Amino acid sequence: MKVALVVTSGQPVVGREAQAIDNARAADAFWRNAAAEGKCSEPEWFWSSTAPAMTIVKGEAEDMQMLMATPEWQRLIMAAPLLIQNFSWELRMCGFDPLFSQFEAAVKEMGLA
């Protein structure tokens, strides 16, 4: 199953701007290295003048979970909320069918369709 790691972030914590930049660069390098090894997509960064920044990395669920369990990623993800306001992340299933087919099966099983 394909999944996407979706990371959102706001402005750096005042006084920690340089550390926030270092953390973002290290996170970008982490995912670019994994992409070069064929384990995921390259990170895509989305910027907005009025909304939080967003980064998306896609890959197979097993590969992404293994990458996210590494000590290197754990250090980066644990430090990020200390450096960046409104930091959050989530792992989402990709595509219409994976979730919809499960929902459809549950609806039929319950006799609601």
Labelled PLM ranges:
Residues M1-P52, G59-A69, W89-A113:
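Short S/T/G/P-rich N-terminal loop/turn motif that feeds into the first structured element of a domain
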Residues D28, E72-A79:
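A common structural junction motif
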Residues L76-C94:
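Conserved short beta-strand edge segments in small beta-sheet-based binding/regulatory domains
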